[in-house]
Structures are given as C-alpha cells and as structure tokens.
C-alpha cells in the first residue's frame, strides 16, 4: 500500500512518518499486527529513529501539528513530541500482547540518553520505568575510557535505568578498521572490542550482546572477526527475553549413559543443553546444545541435561549421572 504523502514529513536527508498524526500512530500498530499475525516472528524491533536528528539550521517544522493536536493538552511542543513517540511505543507493545503475546518488542536507542530525550524526543527512561519495552539494546558505539562519550560512561548511565527490562549491549563493530578520523585511534585494532566486552561482562544487568554489522564481521578488518570468535569461544544458551516470568519446560527424565552416550526422554517442543559438573558449588560447563535426545559425551565426568523452549526458557537441571 502506498503511504499517503500527507502522512509524511520531509527533512534534509530523510522522509519520515509524521509522528503527530493519529492516522500514523494507528498505521504503525496495524503494520505490527499484520506482521505478527501473518508470520511466525520471534520479535518486533525498532531502531533508533524517532523524531529526526536535525542538521544545523534545520527546523522540526511541526508548529501546525502542535496547534492542531497538542496545544490544549501539553505545556510545550517538546512535551507534545515526546508523547507522540510514547504513544507509538506503548501501543506497539499493547498490540503485541493483545494479538500474540509470545512475540518480543525490542528497541535499540542511541547511546546518549539525554540526547534521546531532548533531540529525538524518545523518553527512554520513561519506557523502562513503565515496562513498555521488553528488550533494550543501547547502541554503545564508542571506545572504552573514563571520559565523557566513552563506552564505559554510557554503559554506567544505562545501568541506572535498566531494572526489569532485559538489556543487550549494541557493539559498533563497523567502526573497527575504518578510515574515518572521527572514530579515533582505538578502532585501529580489535583490542578495544575485547575491553568493551570485558567491561560489560561485569554488569549483572547485561543479558547479552548485539553486533552491528554482519558485513563488518565477515570483512574481518583489523582482525575483528577473529577477535569475536575468541570472545564467543565458549558455548552458551540464548537468554530468555520474555516480558513475564518464564513458565519452565518440563525437566528431562530417565537420563542415562551408555558407552559414552548420554540419553533422556523427549520433552515436547524442546531443545536441550548438556552440562558437565565441576563440583558442588561451582559453575557447570556447557558442553553441548542439541535437538536430539542423545549426546556424545566429550569424556569422563558427571553430567546433567536441561530442556529449553522456543522462547529459550530453561528447565531445572535433570538428575546427575556419571560416566
């Protein structure tokens, strides 16, 4: 369907849906509903585009919309703009919950929370407080350091506001090996990516990572693809990112070993993680992930199995068996 021109606004480098128009707000909800109804998607994701980031001398040019839709309800045009974005964010989650609640809603805002609020009119702090977003993925596309606009500074700021919302960190691997002088010397080698991951790994509220982009990973400039392989060398299960407390799958039963093969009874709709015990009170080692109900063990030891469902909710561990 063609987009009515009257529903759009043009700026120097971008054409956007007019955030102030009720017709636009409804259309976005309709699009989301159509996607999750027609297709078996895991989630709906929104990037960092809300109101546009204006160039010098450019105006938002929305006084007419404020006069028509907002002047009687809001004290300022800035408050009006933030509400327009709030309505879309809140309603996307609502239509998902009402239509197909297993679908996840994620947003990846720019790193600077204050700029999101004052320039893009995205009140991310409010969304997190109200629980309107299931997963937040701040784009921390900066080098590590102690100063303003560093990876560390931005991550610390986000950790103040992330509570019930799942948080994944967005890493800007596209900057590594770039000739753009604005990026700085830290991106001339892969070492800073390792530092970024090390810093994020110390934050208990960080649930995982998202890398932008796959093209740059494959290009392997300054060995960034190799560094990523090293960072991800240990197996892991995908975290559960649902908005409600997970309903755990059934625990695998009748776990047994036979000549180095571990087997168990099937759990409907599940895949499985196999762990090796490192002793009481110590973190077990994930040795394999499989959709089969048997697994070739890597060696002698004590093992257990868990079941995971489509949403990656993980069951309690099975009984321990020793081979």
Where are the model-predicted features located?
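Beta-strand-rich modules
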Residues: 296-315
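Pro/Thr/Ser/Gly-rich low-complexity, intrinsically disordered linker/stalk tracts
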Residues: 223, 227-268, 312-323
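Substrate-binding cleft of secreted/luminal carbohydrate-active enzymes
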Residues: 132-148, 157-158, 163-245
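Active-site neighborhood of glycoside hydrolase catalytic domains
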Residues: 23-135, 139, 150-164
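Active-site-adjacent "subsite" loops/lids of carbohydrate-active enzymes
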Residues: 1-38
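Short beta-strand segments within Ig-like beta-sandwich modules, predominantly Fibronectin type-III
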Residues: 285-291
